[in-house]
């Protein structure tokens, strides 16, 4: 192999390694920012299409209805826990340390973002309540159709 070809091969190889490293770093950075949406039943039983369950420690979003009588507040701090349910019957407990939205109440549809502690518990870093009587994210709306307290959107 002549020196010119060796030089081209070396440069091409270095570029391929650098590109692979850059792609790997980008994917690693994005992995930490991707939040997957689950319902309580999907967390317990897995996604319908794939059967894939979230892993303990995984960052995710969960949507459902706050179970009546499940909200427990710590009188000495902002810590609160409550149960979420969907039409599949799965119940997941959410722990949150912070100020809940003004529209948060029992029987209300909410979305919580946080990390999965175990198969039925989530440590939420953020809790979102729907902002008016009509709007609800499509994923939550689909998951809650058939619930007693839920009125589906009329688009």
Swiss-Prot record:
It comes from the Bacteria. It is found in: Cell inner membrane. Residues 1-8 are cytoplasmic. InterPro entries: CcmE, CcmE-like_sf, NA-bd_OB-fold. It is a single-pass type II membrane protein. GO terms for molecular function: heme binding; metal ion binding. Heme chaperone required for the biogenesis of c-type cytochromes. Transiently binds heme delivered by CcmC and transfers the heme to apo-cytochromes in a process facilitated by CcmF and CcmH. This is Cytochrome c-type biogenesis protein CcmE.
């Amino acid at each position: 192999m002549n020196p010119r070809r060796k030089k081209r091969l070396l440069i091409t190889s270095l570029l391929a390694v650098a590109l692979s490293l850059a792609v790997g770093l980008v994917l690693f950075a994005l992995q930490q920012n991707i939040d997957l949406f689950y319902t309580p039943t999907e967390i317990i039983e897995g996604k319908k299409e794939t059967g894939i369950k979230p892993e303990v420690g995984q960052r995710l979003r969960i949507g459902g209805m706050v179970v009546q009588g499940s909200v427990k507040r710590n009188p000495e701090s902002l810590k609160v826990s409550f149960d979420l349910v969907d039409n599949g019957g799965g119940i997941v407990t959410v722990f949150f340390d912070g100020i809940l939205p003004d529209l948060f109440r029992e029987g209300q549809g909410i979305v919580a973002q946080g990390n999965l502690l175990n198969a039925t518990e989530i440590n939420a870093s953020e809790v979102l309540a729907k902002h008016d009587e009509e709007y609800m994210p499509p994923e939550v709306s689909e998951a809650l159709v058939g619930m007693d307290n839920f009125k589906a959107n009329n688009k």
